[in-house]
Every structure is written in C-alpha cells, then in structure tokens.
Amino acid sequence: MTQRGRAAKPTGPTGRPRRTGGQRGTDRVGRGGDLATRRARLHQVVEPVVQGAGYDLEDLSVSRAGRRHVVQVIVDADGGVDLDAVADVSRAVSAALDAAEEVGGDIVAGEYQLEVSSPGVARPLTLPRHWRRNTGRLVRFTVRGGPEAVDRQVTGRVVEADDERVVVETDAGRTEWRHAELGPGRVQVEFTRPGEPDAFDGTDEAGDFDDDDVEDEER
C-alpha cells in the first residue's frame, strides 16, 4: 500500500485556497453538492486513471480518520499487482485528483490521505475475474440452494474459472458451478500449498508494506 496526502494548509501547491476543516460531525467529501455527488465525481476521476494504467478498480472508498479523510483505492490485474505498479498508480491518481480540483474545486475537503493497495486475501471473491485470478487457491464459499433447498458451505481448490463457471476440487472430487449458484468466496490462508515445499517465504504481498516502505507525502 502506498500513501499520499494533502495537509490542511491555507493554500495548495499552486496557491489555490484550500479549506482547512469541515463541519463537525459530518463526512463531507468536498465543497458544494451532496456527499453522493462528490463520491461520484471522485469515481469519475479515479477509475479512468486506473483502467488507463491497465488495472481494474476493485474498490474506492472515503472514510474519516480524525480530522482528515482517507481515500482508499484498491486495484488488481491478472497476474497481480507489484509494489512498483501500486506506486505508479498512486502517483497517477494523485496527479489526476490535483488536476480535477484545479478545474472544478475540491473533491475532498481539507486534509486527505490517498491510500492505494492491492486487494489482499481478505477481500471476498464476487466477480468472475476474482475467481479466475485465484485459480489454484483454497477457497471457502456458499453454494446457493435455491428456493426449496438449503445453502451449504464448501471448501475446495479452484481448478478452473471463466466468465460463466467455476470448477472446484474438493475431497469428494471436482464439481462445476455457475457463478449465479455461488455466494462470495473467501481465500483460505495456506502456509504450504500443494506442490510447493514452503509457500511462506517471508516476503510481503503487493498490498502489504513495512513502515519503511510507505511513502507519505504531505502537500
């Protein structure tokens, strides 16, 4: 995860006045308009940048952390996202936000921190591409039982996945399901995966930085 931020200062880098605070007890994303409108504008700025860099925008959220907003951008791609890619996307998104605010005013009011990261294993598998990108992993998921049957939990290894179906190998053998039959999947953490002598090598995934690796720029 990379972090960039904008401090609450009287003026920004270009001399444009910035608001240094918001209304107490509110979660405003920007000046004027309602929260939903500002969130939509944020999405319109961020998504083309992420897609233009060759990645999928998996999530975009805004939250409050004390006096500042936190803008969290989660990106992914086939083959995963490495540290350099996360840093590149972070710089590109930060520049796009600055440019958009120069034209149309603040999108995020006052102080904000931009965090860009990869999904990590904790995020649920909800789209066909999520299952495809986790081929070979052990996943726990719900098989929907339909109107007259009971949902059941299944744990198995994803063998194949495309836009229509998922093939999972369990203790009972291989079974194919359509995506419509499945609830969200959860990747199960394995320290040693089949065919690997030791899958835990002590390295961090793209979304996990040590403190020394985090870039925190105050603007």
From Swiss-Prot:
Subcellular location field: Cytoplasm
Stretches the record annotates as Disordered: 1-38, 189-219
Coiled-coil portions: none
Entries under Pfam families matching the protein: RimP_N
GO cellular component, one term: cytosol
Matches recorded under Gene3D superfamilies: RimP-like superfamily, N-terminal (3.30.300.70)
Sequence ranges of Acidic residues compositional bias: 198-219
The entry's keywords: Cytoplasm, Ribosome biogenesis
Gene Ontology terms: biological process: ribosomal small subunit assembly; translation
Main location: cytoplasm
HAMAP family linked to this entry: RimP (MF_01077)
Family, as annotated: Belongs to the RimP family.
The protein's name in its UniProt record: Ribosome maturation factor RimP
Gene, per the UniProt record: rimP
